[in-house]
Amino acid sequence: MPMDLRDNKQSQKKWKNRTLTSSLEFALTGIFTAFKEERNMKKHAVSALLAVIAGLVFKVSVIEWLFLLLSIFLVITFEIVNSAIENVVDLASDYHFSMLAKNAKDMAAGAVLVISGFAALTGLIIFVPKIWFLLFH
């Protein structure tokens, strides 16, 4: 029996966020789920906390804060997207090995690695001169 387009639209409406509050609630649930279930998110959170503490201790400039916070939020965002991609791939592949599934997961993890490299480089550029000055002056 062919599916009626109206039935499909009605079922889509049931799941569509109707208010800003419900959209925000779903988004926050996703963020909390990522922190609760993903081991790497906890590591990123600890790294972010240490970077913020270092920024406060070394009294970084406004521009340095912008780059520091950009790095932190980019890493967390990419990790959430990576986790979402991994979940969708696992769902679609029903946990069976597929080279396409592996490639998708590897590429998503690679994106996190690239942005983490950017964050590490940003941290080095900001903090190494300050630590150097502290140690040798």
Swiss-Prot record:
Keyword Transferase: yes
Pfam family name, one: DAGK_prokar
GO cellular component: plasma membrane
MF term (GO), any: ATP binding
Membrane topology: Multi-pass membrane protein
EC top class named in words: transferase
Subcellular location: Cell membrane
Superkingdom of the source species: Bacteria
Gene3D superfamilies the record matches: 1.10.287.3610
Principal subcellular localization: membrane
Transmembrane spans: 43-58, 62-78, 109-129
CDD domains from the UniProt entry: UDPK_IM_like
Alphabetized InterPro entries for the sequence: DAGK (IPR000829), DAGK_sf (IPR036945), UDPK (IPR033717)
Cytoplasmic face of the membrane: 1-42, 79-108
UniProt feature coiled coil, ranges: none
Substrates-to-products reaction catalysed: di-trans,octa-cis-undecaprenol + ATP = di-trans,octa-cis-undecaprenyl phosphate + ADP + H(+)
Keywords: ATP-binding, Cell membrane, Kinase, Lipid biosynthesis, Lipid metabolism, Membrane, Nucleotide-binding, Phospholipid biosynthesis, Phospholipid metabolism, Stress response, Transferase, Transmembrane, Transmembrane helix
Observed effect of gene inactivation: Cells lacking this gene display defective growth at low pH, elevated temperatures, and high osmolarity. Moreover, they exhibit a significant reduction in the transcription level of mutA and a defect in production of the lantibiotic mutacin II. They also show reduced resistance to bacitracin.
GO BP, sorted A to Z: phospholipid biosynthetic process
EC number: 2.7.1.66
Function: Catalyzes the phosphorylation of undecaprenol, which is probably the primary physiological substrate. Is also able to phosphorylate diacylglycerol, albeit with very low efficiency. May play a role in adaptability to environmental stress conditions such as acid tolerance, elevated temperatures and high osmolarity.
Family per record: Belongs to the bacterial diacylglycerol kinase family.
Protein name: Undecaprenol kinase
Record lineage: Bacteria, Bacillati, Bacillota, Bacilli, Lactobacillales
